[in-house]
């Protein structure tokens, strides 16, 4: 513990040292109800063993106190790899290694395994946020790591980090906006004819395959449902020769601690569950997160992971559906490109200069890509 900028600074290895009331109280001041920054979600990641020292995520949360009041905080991890981040810096690590330098460990401010934009520098005001950034920089110097990375902050926070000397990087995701549609057909009516026809054909294929779908709200999800979803989730990772990041204990924990934010879509055929999609939502935003299947049916992924959640958004008046990382195919289903941000600080001056030049070139490519995507707007009004 030390006193800096009129705040007491604590660096803790467990979120419980900050406490749920203090953490969620500070989060509530950020102006958006982001479920992934909630104590319940982060605590579930840690306590389930999904994001912990053994998996390469060593928590090192920073908390700034004004007296007994939590004035600022951020989720920070010491990492020895770049898995589960969705802002790719593997090439940077390779370049360090080729020059005989160590890229790991590094500091990462992010929600593990979650490419969702939201507040990262939690603070009661802009002055406390500025102090938090200074403490973050001091922490990097004290721990002698190669770099610090803040992933998916809102643009306002990203610009403040840029003003503090961080390098800014941008990316693209695809989000759907609810224009107060009366129903799914009203949404379809706004799309180009070809897009509308393709979506109806995809939904028809699923129905003709004898598949039915049911939506289960968080409080109604049974242990059997969770076991089945986890089986689907793990099966899909195995099919891609990958190791799943999350486990059954994590899913059960969020189901118990934040049921009002959970929706599970289960696909069944001949009375047997064959696939499932898990989304997380607030009153105004839905986030597509996890999908898996144990039996393949053409177009079922689109039905369970996109069309069912879209219908849910329309029924519940949810304004935004964030589709997750990557995926131009989402545009054909009414999702539009949205810019995301990350901020990076590298200790090695020569590499910092080289990466700054790389990011300048990359930013030009992202601008061109956004222009190209916007020209392919799937809605009828854009086509004239």
Predicted segments, located by residue:
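N-acyltransferase acceptor-side catalytic subdomain
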Residues: 1-384
């Amino acid at each position: 513990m030390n006193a800096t900028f009129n705040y007491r600074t604590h660096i803790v290895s467990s979120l419980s040292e900050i406490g749920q009331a203090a953490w969620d109280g500070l989060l509530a001041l950020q102006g958006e109800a982001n479920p992934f920054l909630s104590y319940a979600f982060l605590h579930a990641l840690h306590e389930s063993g999904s994001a912990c020292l053994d998996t390469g995520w060593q928590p090192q949360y920073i908390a700034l106190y004004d007296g007994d009041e939590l004035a600022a905080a951020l989720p920070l991890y010491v990492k020895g790899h770049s898995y589960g981040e969705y802002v790719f810096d593997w090439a940077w690590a390779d370049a360090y290694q080729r020059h005989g330098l160590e890229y790991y460990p590094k500091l990462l401010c992010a929600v593990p395994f979650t490419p969702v934009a939201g507040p990262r520098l939690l603070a009661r005001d802009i002055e406390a946020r500025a102090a938090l950034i200074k403490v973050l920089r001091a922490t990097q110097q004290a721990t002698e790591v190669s770099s610090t990375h803040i992933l998916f902050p809102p643009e306002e926070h990203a610009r403040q980090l840029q003003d503090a000397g961080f390098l800014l990087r941008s990316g693209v995701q695809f989000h759907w906006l609810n224009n107060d549609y009366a129903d799914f057909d009203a949404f379809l009516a706004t799309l180009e004819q070809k897009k509308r026809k393709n979506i109806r054909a995809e939904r028809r294929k699923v129905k003709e395959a004898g598949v039915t779908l049911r939506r289960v709200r968080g409080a109604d999800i049974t242990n059997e449902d969770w076991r089945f979803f986890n089986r689907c989730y793990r099966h899909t990772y195995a099919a891609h020769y990958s190791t799943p990041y999350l486990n059954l204990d994590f899913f059960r924990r969020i189901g118990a601690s934040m049921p009002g934010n959970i929706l599970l879509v289960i696909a069944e055929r001949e009375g047997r569950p064959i696939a499932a999609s898990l989304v997380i939502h607030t009153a105004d935003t839905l986030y597509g997160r996890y999908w898996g299947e144990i039996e393949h049916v053409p177009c079922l992924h689109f039905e369970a992971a996109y069309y069912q959640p879209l219908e849910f958004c329309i029924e519940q008046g949810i304004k935004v559906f964030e589709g997750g990382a990557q995926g131009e195919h989402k545009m054909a289903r009414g999702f539009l490109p949205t810019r995301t941000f990350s901020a990076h600080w590298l200790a090695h001056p020569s590499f910092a200069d080289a990466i700054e030049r790389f990011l300048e070139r990359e930013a030009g490519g992202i601008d061109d890509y956004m222009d190209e995507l916007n020209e392919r707007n799937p809605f009828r009004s854009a086509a004239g």
